[in-house]
């Protein structure tokens, strides 16, 4: 995920036709509406976030020493999945390999991984994948296109102070490395709900990432695996959902979505529970449960999923505040989940007072900030009845030509 901005464009002459399995997976993805993002790696030991290697120009040889001390003794996949399910989330997306190149799984393509380079010696992605299947929640993998560590990744806009030789890069080698790792992830870890790409904004606009071939490989290995790419542009051929970083669709408050239209693909917005993606010890600026719920509702009202991020601690635990917030969001979802799960953006466009979602012939009006005693809802459809969702108490309304 980005700490700065740059542009990237990729064109395609190919026509991507998704398989029936993929179409079904897209619908399930839209129905699920809510996921939890986990940014976890050896950078958590710095307690300064996932960009620490780049922002502090840490030499890669020194940075690699973090691995020898990484021993998350309190990691328990069952506890993680259970806590996340409590929130009402239907899927988990975890960093398999971030920009620092450290792989959080047992890869044969690099010894810079959690099994070979740490005293922990456990494949946490394998444990998490098995637990997700056991508890009935989907697992997605974040995968970085850029790399601050390897010599074969071509020099880009970031990672200049990590000690790699000037003018380094061997694209053919790096591309082969990525595809072999993706093959491992899609072969050894059971059903994968999605691959969540990030980082192609690191290269110039004319850089050829060979996405078509890479996407085709993923769809060949697992046809129902969805592909999304955090390039901050309108989706390219081969992608199955569109993502928005720290923004609701159609907005550009974070500054990443200026060149991004809204496609017909399923939509997802990602946001942090506090301020950072990776664990940062002094970042206690958590959004309140109410703020998180409102963001989830607003995303649903804009026909999008919410992928809400937590940065696990270096000892393997989820932060206590995050766990408590998951519980509070879950309490709300237990009551109002029917108005979120399986819905699409409603017929009433988002307003300052709230949003709407719909399911069949039912329209759910989510009033988040009512300023007056009465509310005018612009709606051309004829309303048969209006009730308060929980109590089922009938609500009085007046049908007019263009609304109620």
Locations of regions flagged by a protein language model:
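Mature catalytic domains of secreted/periplasmic carbohydrate-active enzymes
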Residues: 10-404
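Bacterial Sec-dependent N-terminal signal peptides
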Residues: 1-12
């Amino acid at each position: 995920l980005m700490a700065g901005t740059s542009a990237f464009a990729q064109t395609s002459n190919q026509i991507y036709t998704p398989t029936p399995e993929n179409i079904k997976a897209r619908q399930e993805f839209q129905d699920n509406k809510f996921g939890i993002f986990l940014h976890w790696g050896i950078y958590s030991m710095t307690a300064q976030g996932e960009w620490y290697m780049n922002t502090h120009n840490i030499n890669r040889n020194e940075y690699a020493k973090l691995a020898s001390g990484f021993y998350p003794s309190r990691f328990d996949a069952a506890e993680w999945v259970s806590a996340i399910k409590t929130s009402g989330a239907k899927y988990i997306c975890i960093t398999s390999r971030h920009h620092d190149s450290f792989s959080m799984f047992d890869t044969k393509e690099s010894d810079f991984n959690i099994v070979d380079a740490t005293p922990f010696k456990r494949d946490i992605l394998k444990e998490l994948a098995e637990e997700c299947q056991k508890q009935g929640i989907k697992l997605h993998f974040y995968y970085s296109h850029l790399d601050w560590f390897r010599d074969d990744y071509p020099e880009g806009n970031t990672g200049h102070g990590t000690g790699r030789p000037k003018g380094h890069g061997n694209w053919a080698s790096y591309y082969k490395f990525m595809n072999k790792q993706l093959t491992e992830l899609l072969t050894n870890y059971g059903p994968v709900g999605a691959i969540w790409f990030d980082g192609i904004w690191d290269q110039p606009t004319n850089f050829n990432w060979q996405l078509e071939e890479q996407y085709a490989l993923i769809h060949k290995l697992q046809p129902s695996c969805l592909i999304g790419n955090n390039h901050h542009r309108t989706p390219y051929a081969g992608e199955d959902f569109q993502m928005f970083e720290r923004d609701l669709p159609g907005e550009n408050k974070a500054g990443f979505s200026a060149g991004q239209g809204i496609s017909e693909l399923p939509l997802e917005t990602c946001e942090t529970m506090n301020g950072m993606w990776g664990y940062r010890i002094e970042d206690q600026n958590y959004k309140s449960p109410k703020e998180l719920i409102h963001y989830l509702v607003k995303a649903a009202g804009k026909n999008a999923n919410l992928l809400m991020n937590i940065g696990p601690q270096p000892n393997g635990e989820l932060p206590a505040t995050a766990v408590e917030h998951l519980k509070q969001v879950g309490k709300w979802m237990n009551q109002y989940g029917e108005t979120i799960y399986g819905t699409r953006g409603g017929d009433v466009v988002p307003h300052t007072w709230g949003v709407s979602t719909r399911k069949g012939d039912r329209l759910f009006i989510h009033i988040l900030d009512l300023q007056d005693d009465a509310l005018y809802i612009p709606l051309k459809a004829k309303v048969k009845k209006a009730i308060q969702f929980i109590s089922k108490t009938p609500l009085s309304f007046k049908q007019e030509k263009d609304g109620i």
